[in-house]
From Swiss-Prot:
Residues 1-15 form the signal peptide. This is Surface-adhesin protein E. PROSITE patterns: PROKAR_LIPOPROTEIN. A lipid is attached at residue 16 (S-diacylglycerol cysteine). GO terms for cellular component: cell outer membrane; cell surface. It holds the Pfam family Adhesin_E. InterPro entries: Adhesin_E (IPR043088), Adhesin_E-like (IPR031939), Adhesin_E_Pasteurellaceae (IPR016595). It comes from the Bacteria.
Length: 160
């Protein structure tokens, strides 16, 4: 998953920063935070991929749909800003989970100049939705089960 995110990020970086001179952009190695910030849930041990628990909400119209943000703290700075010395330290991805069929849709990806999806936002001009069916016994599937179980109670109680 981390390789896919980095590949997509590098592709977006190339598209967004074509006019910036490469000589000014040295490779920036980052030291992501080692402590997990309150309100964030690490998906995999020793991987900087988190769910922002404060961003989770259930759709009013379709209670099987849960919206949330995933955050990736980067270990290399990405030059996605017009300023040649500003770089992204994190990526925030807006996702929608369908608890009825375990389809996960990535709606939007934004870059931030601080860790934890904070700070100045840079959004790619073109973004495509991407939906995948989660496979049982994978980290994302297990996380989806937990999200659906915890937030499923909220909408099943409302139906009474």
């Amino acid at each position: 998953m981390k390789k896919i995110i980095l590949t997509l990020s590098l592709g977006l970086l190339t598209a967004c920063s074509a006019q910036i001179q490469k000589a000014e952009q040295n490779d920036v190695k980052l030291a992501p935070p080692t402590d997990v910030r309150s309100g964030y849930i690490r998906l995999v041990k020793n991987v900087n991929y988190y769910i922002d628990s404060e961003s989770i909400w259930v759709d009013n119209q379709e209670p099987q749909i849960v919206h949330f943000d995933a955050v990736v703290n980067l270990d290399r700075g990405l030059y996605v800003y017009p300023e040649p010395k500003r770089y992204a330290r994190s990526v925030r991805q807006y996702k929608i989970l369908n608890c009825a069929n375990y389809h996960l849709t990535q709606i939007r990806t934004d870059f931030y100049d601080e860790f934890w999806g904070q700070g100045l936002r840079a959004a790619p001009k073109k973004q495509k939705k991407h939906t995948l069916s989660l496979t049982p016994d994978t980290t994302l599937y297990n996380a989806a089960q937990i999200i659906c179980a915890n937030y499923g109670k909220a909408f099943s109680v409302d139906k009474k």
